[in-house]
């Protein structure tokens, strides 16, 4: 089963399978050349609410353009720090302080990437095997004497249940998550640092099998979870400590008895 993909990827998949038109590059060049004329025509001729919305859109685009130009100018400015590294040893968290201009450029690039809705996130496991409902749920028969009612389900896979979770009355509880299969911590590996740390799980962001499994907090292979990385001491460019980051489960927790994940950086 594939993880949810962005809608724009079907165009790329088509181009990989069937190729592009012979005049594709020429059409793209002409379309880009016409954009300025189209924007000018819309700005002059639109009326009413459409004109107001269009002006708001153009205003935001111009702000982003000015920010990008300013970031580029900051990137080109030479740093006042000396070219040769100092002989005095520095602790690990102060090594990047001398490269202020590079940090500004990197911060601007990250913000631009977040602003783009079509930004793609590379995950360690882009594909996972599907899990049937028969394998995921076990039917629990209920009924005072006959035990003929079979609307309850017991989850047979590991799950994460938050500390603020309160059970419903037993009579109305449809999905049962056994205490023995509940996990609160995961062994998270940082791909760049090459270290593995046991971190608390904050929540389940996305289970690729089914939105219902995401809501129930089921931990299967390929699930995106949020972990508490405050112990790692990761900080942003502004100096704030990063509290939570996403990680993807890479093992099969129900077979291994533990949750192993790779941090998404």
From Swiss-Prot:
Q: Where is this motif: Nuclear localization signal 2?
A: 56-63
**Belongs to which family?**
Belongs to the eukaryotic ribosomal protein eS8 family. Ribosome biogenesis protein NSA2 subfamily.
Which residues span the membrane?
none
Q: Which InterPro entries match?
A: NSA2_fam (IPR039411), Ribosomal_Se8/biogenesis_NSA2 (IPR022309)
How is this protein organized at the quaternary level?
Answer: Component of the pre-66S ribosomal particle. Interacts with nop7 and rrp1. Interacts with rsa4 (via WD repeats).
Q: Where in the cell is it found?
A: Nucleus, Nucleolus
Report the protein name in the record: Ribosome biogenesis protein nsa2
Gene Ontology CC annotation, any one: preribosome, large subunit precursor
Gene3D superfamilies with a match to the protein in the record: 2.40.10.310
Which is a GO BP term held by this UniProt record? maturation of 5.8S rRNA from tricistronic rRNA transcript (SSU-rRNA, 5.8S rRNA, LSU-rRNA)
**Does Hydrolase count among this protein's keywords?**
no
Q: Where is the composition biased (Basic residues)?
A: 55-69
Q: Which PANTHER family match?
A: RIBOSOME BIOGENESIS PROTEIN NSA2 HOMOLOG
What residue spans carry the Basic and acidic residues bias annotation?
20-40
Where are the annotated segments for Disordered?
A: 17-91
Domain of life, per the record?
Eukaryota
Please name the taxonomic classification of the source: Eukaryota, Fungi, Dikarya, Ascomycota, Pezizomycotina
Q: Motif Nuclear localization signal 1: where? A: 19-26
Per the entry, what this protein does is: Involved in the biogenesis of the 60S ribosomal subunit. May play a part in the quality control of pre-60S particles.
What UniProt keywords are attached to this protein's entry? Nucleus, Ribonucleoprotein, Ribosome biogenesis, rRNA processing
């Amino acid at each position: 089963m594939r993880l949810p993909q962005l809608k724009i990827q079907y165009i790329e998949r088509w181009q990989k399978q069937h190729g592009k038109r012979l005049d594709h590059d020429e059409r793209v060049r002409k379309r880009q050349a016409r954009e300025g004329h189209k924007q000018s025509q819309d700005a002059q001729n639109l009326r009413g609410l459409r004109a107001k919305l269009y002006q708001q859109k153009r205003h935001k685009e111009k702000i982003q353009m000015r920010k990008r130009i300013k970031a580029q100018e900051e990137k080109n400015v030479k740093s006042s720090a000396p070219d040769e590294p100092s002989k005095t040893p520095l602790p690990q968290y102060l090594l990047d302080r001398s490269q202020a201009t590079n940090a500004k450029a990197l911060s601007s690039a990250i913000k631009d990437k977040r602003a783009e809705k079509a930004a793609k996130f590379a995950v360690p496991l882009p594909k996972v095997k599907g899990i049937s409902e028969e394998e995921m749920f076990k039917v629990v028969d209920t009924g005072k004497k006959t035990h003929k009612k079979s609307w309850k389900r017991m989850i047979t896979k590991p799950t994460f249940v938050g500390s603020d979770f309160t059970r419903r009355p037993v009579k109305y509880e449809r999905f049962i998550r056994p205490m023995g299969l509940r996990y609160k911590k995961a062994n998270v590996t940082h791909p760049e640092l090459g270290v593995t740390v046991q971190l608390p799980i904050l929540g389940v962001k996305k289970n690729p099998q089914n939105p219902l499994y995401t809501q129930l907090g089921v931990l299967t292979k390929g699930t995106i979870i949020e972990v508490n990385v405050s112990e790692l001491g990761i900080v942003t460019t502004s100096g704030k400590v990063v509290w939570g980051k996403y990680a993807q489960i890479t093992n099969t927790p129900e077979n291994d008895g533990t949750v192993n994940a790779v941090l998404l950086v």
